[in-house]
Amino acid sequence: MTSQWKCPAKDQSLRNIQRNRRRLGDSGLPATVVRCSKSGATRRNPAVNDASQCSSIVSTVRIGGKDGRHQPKLQSRVLIFELEDKSLSTE
């Protein structure tokens, strides 16, 4: 079953990022920050390390790791995650 994530509300984004990161567990791999164009909200999700896993991405920034390289920016209006992992669904 696929769960779809849209951008969180701007005022909740940082708190949700921290809570979700703890809940999902930090695997030590570089996480990906995905930015939504409309609200400017970001979501940091250790499970999404590849832009191809998301159906539409505004911009992704690679954080962590030694190189700190940026992933290519893709133009889009709405951010929707389509992941197979059921643990990522909102409660």
Swiss-Prot record:
What does the record say about the knockout? Impairs the production of asparasone A.
Presence of keyword Lipid biosynthesis:
no
Q: What is its main location?
A: nucleus
Q: Where in the cell is it found?
A: Nucleus
Per UniProt, the keywords (alphabetical) are: Nucleus, Transcription, Transcription regulation
Look up keyword Transcription and say if it applies.
Answer: yes
List the GO cellular component terms.
nucleus
- Superkingdom is Eukaryota
- Per its record, what triggers expression of this gene product? Expression is induced by the developmental and secondary metabolism regulator veA.
Briefly, what is this protein's role? Transcription factor; part of the gene cluster 27 that mediates the biosynthesis of asparasone A, a sclerotium-specific anthraquinone pigment important for sclerotial survival. Controls the expression of the non-reducing polyketide synthase (NRPKS) pks27.
What name does the UniProt record give this protein? Transcription factor znf27
Q: Which organism is it from?
A: Aspergillus flavus (strain ATCC 200026 / FGSC A1120 / IAM 13836 / NRRL 3357 / JCM 12722 / SRRC 167)
Name of the gene this protein is made from: znf27
